[in-house]
């Protein structure tokens, strides 16, 4: 390692180099299926916009894929600032495309992923043909670099338009260079289901098979076929759709009262969100609100029984498709939606639609209510078997602890909240059934070098240990009182300091909690942005600028509010941004137990927190200080 840290040591990655050096940051490197999905998404976006009616996908024996659509065709004119053709910009520049405004696409799935430029970067060769303006154009790339200039190779009818993308992934970037045919077929069929009237043909030249999908009533037919053979409630799926100003949602739902293999698929702009997200949370909440209202209106609930989302969700099979502008995903591979507004939109639409359906189909509705109530009663019986620590069975619980009612470790959460004022807001914002609040007064003790027998000398840490029901440095979690421990501190530097000290406490003195995945850090927003009737929350300066950039084409002037601390938020804001499972952001505290990674983590923490290593910290700050992100 060099001791001189100068400009010569700084590496600047250009064009597609970041993708080729760190492919795992941009795509799934297990198999190249995600590359195919990116190309297919571009064609499907043309269908969503009303310009394409047919898509053909061919898997060749050499494990290359060819995707053809009859959309508008990629732009071939010269880009005004880049000085090269539009198709070349799209293939060679990260974050380039026609979907960053709503002029070309009302809804688009291709905007928020890695884009076709990453397909180019990770492929041995990419050949593009474009039919546009009555002419056929061709351009080719190898390993991300252009090898054939854009040229006209023929003519076609002026109304004949479209794009052909033929690419062969580079095997060195993937664990297996072979496409998963089953996943590819499932993806294509789902696209056809979700985009009524779109014909999709899949030609598998490896296995010599061919499929054609065209659905006019896609969601209902697809769900019925998926649960074929099982008893369903209702007999025909509960289906519906609704289109708002900037969002549209469609769904199909069935319940399997006698059990069976449940189907749960969600999509955003026809992109499969395998890990769900805020739109699925909204679906759960909408169903819960409607069934609760139905049961209360008809006096169906036994005394002491309160329904939760899991009670109505337990045997539900669903297909959910959301189309929205400015969708935000967690990660480049778009497997989880994180847009907060989608939860509110979907839950509101589903609550109204499901309430109407319940009251129009009373016989089926009462059977559903019976299933949900039975689930709730089973849950309550199971909870009674878990005995909470009482005053007579151990140390008295901290007086400032606002405990929750449930004993279900799958759902209970303890929030460690910075400051009494924020603790007061959190107590009002919480779900009393599942969420407990323990306010902390100021910065806790730095316990990194404190011995286990002395760590409980700190009142704050003693309260944390008693509230959790476990002793420091113990591997016995049998008396653990909460399934999640959530650190909730301000988004400023002081809050980050407190969160760091708490993370150090758990890593050093409660390592079993961390290893078993019980510790989380809440991510409260630093900014609130209001424009007309829309509200957005930004985690940091970069996210604020990204939101403002998206809003600059909308009418009105955004109002930006910076939260100085959690105490500034009213309970409803705190709940929406930080405590509501449907809309909050939580980051799980983990560290790799592997021999190298685990020791590296502990070494870094020791350097940052040990009092005797001030000189090491000074040297580290001198070397890394230019990377700091300061909010002044």
UniProtKB/Swiss-Prot annotation:
GO cellular component terms attached to this protein's record: chromosome
GO molecular function: ATP binding; DNA binding; DNA topoisomerase type II (double strand cut, ATP-hydrolyzing) activity; metal ion binding
Enzyme Commission number: 5.6.2.2
Residues the record lists as binding Mg(2+) 2: 490, 492
PROSITE patterns found in the cross-reference section: TOPOISOMERASE_II, TOPRIM
Catalytic activity: ATP-dependent breakage, passage and rejoining of double-stranded DNA
Annotated protein name in UniProt: DNA topoisomerase 4 subunit B
Lineage per the UniProt record: Bacteria, Pseudomonadati, Pseudomonadota, Gammaproteobacteria, Pasteurellales
Residues reported to bind ATP: 5, 42, 69, 110-116, 334
Keyword Mitochondrion: no
Assembly information from the UniProt record: Heterotetramer composed of ParC and ParE.
Chain's role: Topoisomerase IV is essential for chromosome segregation. It relaxes supercoiled DNA. Performs the decatenation events required during the replication of a circular DNA molecule.
Enzyme class label: isomerase
Sequence positions that bind Mg(2+) 1: 418, 490
SMART domains: HATPase_c, TOP2c
InterPro entries (alphabetical): DNA_gyrase_B_C, HATPase_C_sf, Ribosomal_Su5_D2-typ_SF, Ribsml_uS5_D2-typ_fold_subgr, Topo_IIA, Topo_IIA-like_dom_sf, Topo_IIA_B_C, Topo_IIA_bsu_dom2
Assigned protein family: Belongs to the type II topoisomerase family. ParE type 1 subfamily.
Keywords annotated in UniProt: ATP-binding, DNA-binding, Isomerase, Magnesium, Metal-binding, Nucleotide-binding, Topoisomerase
Keyword hit for DNA-binding: yes
Site residues, Interaction with DNA: 443, 446, 497, 617
GO biological process, one term: chromosome segregation
Disulfide bonds: none
Pfam families, per database record: DNA_gyraseB, DNA_gyraseB_C, HATPase_c, Toprim
Cofactor(s) for this UniProt protein: Mg(2+); Mn(2+); Ca(2+)
UniProt cofactor note: Binds two Mg(2+) per subunit. The magnesium ions form salt bridges with both the protein and the DNA. Can also accept other divalent metal cations, such as Mn(2+) or Ca(2+).
């Amino acid at each position: 390692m060099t001791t001189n840290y100068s400009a010569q040591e700084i590496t600047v990655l250009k064009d597609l180099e970041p993708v080729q050096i760190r492919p795992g940051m941009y795509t799934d490197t297990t198999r190249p299926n995600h590359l195919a999905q990116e190309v297919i998404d571009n064609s499907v976006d043309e269908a969503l916009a009303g310009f394409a009616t047919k898509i053909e996908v061919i898997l060749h024996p050499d494990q290359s894929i060819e995707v053809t659509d009859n959309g508008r065709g990629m732009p071939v004119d010269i880009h005004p600032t880049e000085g090269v053709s539009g198709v070349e910009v799209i293939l060679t520049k990260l974050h380039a495309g026609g979907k960053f405004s709503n002029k070309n696409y009302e809804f688009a799935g291709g905007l928020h992923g890695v884009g076709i430029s990453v397909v180019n970067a990770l492929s041995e060769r990419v050949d593009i043909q474009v039919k546009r303006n009555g002419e056929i154009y061709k351009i080719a790339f190898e390993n991300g670099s252009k090898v054939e200039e854009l040229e006209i190779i023929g003519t076609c009818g002026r109304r004949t338009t479209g794009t052909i993308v033929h690419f062969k992934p580079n095997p060195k970037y993937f664990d297996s260079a072979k496409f998963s045919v089953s996943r590819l077929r499932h993806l294509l069929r789902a696209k056809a289901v979700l985009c009524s009237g779109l014909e999709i043909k899949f030609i598998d030249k490896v296995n010599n098979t061919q499929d054609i999908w065209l659905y006019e009533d896609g969601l209902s037919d697809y769900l019925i076929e998926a649960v074929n053979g099982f008893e369903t409630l209702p007999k025909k799926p509960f289906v519906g759709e609704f289109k708002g100003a900037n969002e549209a949602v469609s769904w199909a739902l069935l319940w399997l009262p006698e059990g069976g293999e449940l189907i749960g698929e969600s999509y955003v702009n026809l992109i499969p969100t395998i890990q769900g997200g805020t739109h699925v949370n909204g679906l759960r909440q909408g169903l819960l609100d409607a069934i609760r209202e139905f049961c209360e209106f008809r006096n169906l609930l036994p005394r002491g029984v309160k329904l939760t989302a899991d009670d109505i969700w337990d045997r539900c099979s669903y297909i959910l498709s959301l189309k929205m502008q400015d969708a935000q995903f967690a990660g480049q591979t778009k497997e989880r939606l994180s847009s907060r507004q989608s939860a509110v939109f979907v839950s509101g639409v589903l609550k109204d639609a499901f309430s109407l359906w319940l009251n129009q189909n009373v016989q089926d509705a009462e059977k559903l209510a019976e299933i949900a109530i039975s689930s709730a009663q089973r849950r309550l019986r199971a909870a009674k078997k878990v005995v909470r620590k009482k005053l007579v069975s151990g140390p008295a619980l901290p007086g400032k602890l606002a405990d929750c009612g449930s004993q279900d470790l799958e759902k209970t959460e303890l929030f460690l909240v910075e400051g009494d004022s924020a603790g007061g807001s959190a107590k009002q914002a919480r779900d009393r059934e599942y969420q407990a609040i323990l306010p902390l007064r100021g910065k806790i003790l730095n316990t990194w070098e404190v011995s286990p027998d002395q760590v409980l000398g700190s009142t704050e840490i003693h309260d944390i240990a008693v509230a959790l029901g476990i002793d420091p440095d113990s591997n016995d979690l049998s008396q653990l009182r909460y399934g999640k421990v959530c650190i909730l501190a301000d988004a400023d530097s002081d809050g980050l300091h407190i969160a760091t000290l708490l993370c150090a406490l758990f890593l050093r003195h409660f390592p079993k909690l961390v290893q078993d995945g019980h510790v989380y850090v809440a991510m409260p927003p630093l900014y609130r942005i209001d424009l007309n009737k829309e509200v957005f929350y930004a985690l940091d300066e970069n996210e604020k600028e990204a939101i403002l950039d998206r809003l600059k084409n909308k009418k009105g002037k955004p109002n930006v509010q910076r939260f100085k601390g959690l105490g500034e938020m009213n309970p409803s804001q705190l709940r929406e941004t930080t405590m509501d499972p449907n809309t909050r952001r939580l980051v799980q505290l983990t560290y790799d137990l592997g021999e190298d990674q685990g020791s590296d983590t502990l070494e870094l923490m020791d350097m940052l927190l040990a009092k005797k290593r001030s000189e090491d910290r000074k040297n580290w700050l001198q070397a890394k200080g230019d990377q700091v992100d300061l909010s002044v």
